[in-house]
Regions:
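Substrate-binding/active-site clefts of carbohydrate-active enzymes
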Residues: 1-129, 137-166
Length: 168
């Protein structure tokens, strides 16, 4: 549901990414999913309200394991342009670490990156009234090293968030 772009290797073949798993802007909706592409947020909020009136909860499918950034020879799109080393896991040569096969991985061991993720989640709950989330490659969210940590800082911070209580 987040604004996304087609991966360069798909573009070269004239193909599209219809699933949206190449996110560019976590606070923005993919306009092509809306009937009114100039006002997708209004349409989304109306949809959520209508679904709630029918007794249906809204669970968003979100991608916080990676972003649309590709190799460094490709254009900069999002977090790389803000602070590449803060937002992404990198090796000693500055290349992206790719534990998932997605090209890059958000560094959720970093305080700034975690805050950004939690701010995004808070936005969708408080502004759009969604009821929960499904996390793509969810175990990656618990990586503060190459290994999964069930007590990762992101999980602890999530549990302390006041908006989280609304989701229970």
């Amino acid at each position: 549901m987040n604004f996304f772009i087609d991966e360069p290797h798909l573009q070269e073949k004239g193909l599209r990414n219809y699933w949206g798993y190449n996110p560019l802007a976590m606070f923005a909706l993919e306009p092509s999913y809306a009937a009114d592409q100039k006002h997708p947020l209004n349409e989304f909020k109306s949809m959520v309200k209508t679904l709630h009136q029918a007794g249906i909860e809204v669970i968003l499918d979100v991608v916080f394991n990676h972003t649309a950034e590709s190799e460094k020879t490709f254009p900069t799109f999002c977090q790389r342009g803000i602070d590449d080393k803060t937002y992404y896991w990198q090796n000693e040569h500055g290349d992206y670490i790719n534990w998932t096969g997605c090209g890059n991985m958000l560094n959720l061991a970093n305080d700034v990156t975690r805050k950004w993720v939690l701010d995004c989640l808070r936005y969708w709950v408080t502004e759009c009234h969604v009821d929960g989330f499904r996390f793509d490659l969810a175990t990656v969210l618990g990586r503060e090293t190459p290994d999964f940590n069930p007590n990762a800082q992101l999980f602890a911070e999530w549990n302390r968030m006041t908006f989280y209580n609304k989701l229970n």
